[in-house]
Amino acid sequence: MARVSREEVEHIANLSKLHISPEETTEMQDTLETILNFAQQIDTADTSSVEPTYHVLDLQNVLREDKAIPGIPQSLALKNAKETEDGQFKVPSIISGEDA
């Protein structure tokens, strides 16, 4: 049976940046002990004959074949641009200073 001291609860609360009252400390002490006892029960279960499961459902990825297809022509992509330069969109600079 797991025992959690008041000091451990206060330490956990401090690490979590929580301010808890003495009553809450007692309540959290009981809650943590219950959780740890349950975890110990699970730990004692005999799983030696159980095959490891990575997912509860038998799922497989369904992927399509990756095929390259032609995109739209550059002239069509740039057709409605306000400004272009050397076959590219030209936009106002948003970075100023030495790194620009």
From Swiss-Prot:
Question: Which HAMAP family does the protein's record reference?
Answer: GatC
Q: Give GO terms for biological process.
A: glutaminyl-tRNAGln biosynthesis via transamidation; regulation of translational fidelity; translation
Recorded hits in Pfam families, A to Z, give: GatC (PF02686)
Q: Give the EC class as a word.
A: ligase
What keywords are annotated for this sequence in UniProt? ATP-binding, Ligase, Nucleotide-binding, Protein biosynthesis
Q: What Gene3D superfamilies has UniProt attached to this entry?
A: Glu-tRNAGln amidotransferase C subunit, N-terminal domain
Q: What protein name applies here?
A: Aspartyl/glutamyl-tRNA(Asn/Gln) amidotransferase subunit C
Entry GO MF terms: asparaginyl-tRNA synthase (glutamine-hydrolyzing) activity; ATP binding; glutaminyl-tRNA synthase (glutamine-hydrolyzing) activity
Q: Which domain of life is it from?
A: Bacteria
